[in-house]
């Protein structure tokens, strides 16, 4: 209800300013200062004081007096009253606001906004198919998946794509190495999975190219070039050789994505835009551009008009295209098929992103359709990570460690559980997985993406602090309360519908009203976070929501309330809270356990 309430406040302020013949270009509607017990406030009096030739508090009083809240106006459904404190005009909500919030949040889908009619493609991860997913690249997956989930909650129709580089040098090296080396000459794979099996060939190939004698390296490079040129020429046999490697690796990597509950709707292969001629068509169009130059034996685009010093090379001297050339064709395909495109990129790709955007404009595209948020890297306490030589930390290793540590924590807490149900070994395994994977996802997505992260176990798995387990425990606690009410009272809470929940006047305490305020804010938080592509805002909301729920839990007994109707009212509030926290967790890709 916060969103319609905010609209009412904006209308009220604008109408009052019009009545007073004051400018309405900036209404100043915002969250009030902490010491002001209002839901929204307007600081517009600050801006207008000089033009009104009066002090901000007096201007605020005049504006507040001009707001018409008479019952017969029937303009405002949720504004109860307006007052001022200093220069702030403060807006307070009525009981209908709380009642409609409680009613709306009985829906398990609470927080989903109406359909926007907009189609969006979110491209993320897109790691080269050369081996297992690395921890650093895992941030792309976690951040990108959360952005896609957030946009779906915002009402967009979202497709998740993985752009597969199956045409570059690394794939050429991989294919050559796979065909050259015998499995018996390689170390045992670290896991029984295709990506771990095949990465051995890639690592051995790179070792060979670095350490073999010059003649052997030259011969190998000729074979690698033949593979790359064969792909560029659309040679079917070469394509099939490459796909034998690529498809196996992607199949293995998919297991890591599945562990994170990160879903891809489609893997878009780079060779698609070679084979269908789109990349060649882009080359011909770029050659005819006024800013096209032929320098250093390559066709380039001079981007100085876009304040980009480095030219974009789009065609090599041997007639082969580059990754960005093919990506230009890829993006034009996305523009043709979707209303908007989001590409999640590492911060080391900022120059390429700028070059891509500028060149797309040169090709006549509206790049307002394209957003390219960046993320920084993830480090473990012992330092940075790398993949090419196999010296980095794989995402699977991090998830295994998280689950193992979570299992230890669950075992340690068994004796202090409040609920009298028993946990089987399968329950403990489930909770350990939910908590361990959730800890990794939440700890990564809760940070602003452009800030580097050093992953710390004690923080990520802290059940008592501001972490995923702390928030997950709130959901489990809600489930436990509902189960206890069903088991120990005559109430059938499953029969409580949005039409039969008790009157909101039952819920009068500060803790109850504060929790309802947080529930009411959730859809607006989704809307704001989606507009800025900032899932960390949802993570922050979930954390503060958990704190507010725990205050309610400490101060307001549900099972031992003074009457059955009060129990019914409070359990309705608990269910509304459960739906809110479950969906906040869902947006950031964290499971909501029913027990812990």
Swiss-Prot record:
UniProt-recorded Gene Ontology molecular function terms: arginine-tRNA ligase activity; ATP binding
EC number: 6.1.1.19
Superkingdom in the source lineage: Archaea
Main localization, broad class: cytoplasm
Keywords, ordered alphabetically: Aminoacyl-tRNA synthetase, ATP-binding, Cytoplasm, Ligase, Nucleotide-binding, Protein biosynthesis
Record-level GO BP terms: arginyl-tRNA aminoacylation
Enzyme class: ligase
Compartments, as annotated in UniProt: Cytoplasm
A matching Pfam family: tRNA-synt_1d
Annotated motif 'HIGH' region, positions: 127-137
GO CC annotations, alphabetized: cytoplasm
Homology family: Belongs to the class-I aminoacyl-tRNA synthetase family.
PANTHER family documented for this protein: ARGININE--TRNA LIGASE, CYTOPLASMIC, ARGINYL-TRNA SYNTHETASE
Name by which UniProt lists this protein: Arginine--tRNA ligase
Organism expressing this protein natively: Haloquadratum walsbyi (strain DSM 16790 / HBSQ001)
Gene name linked to the record: argS
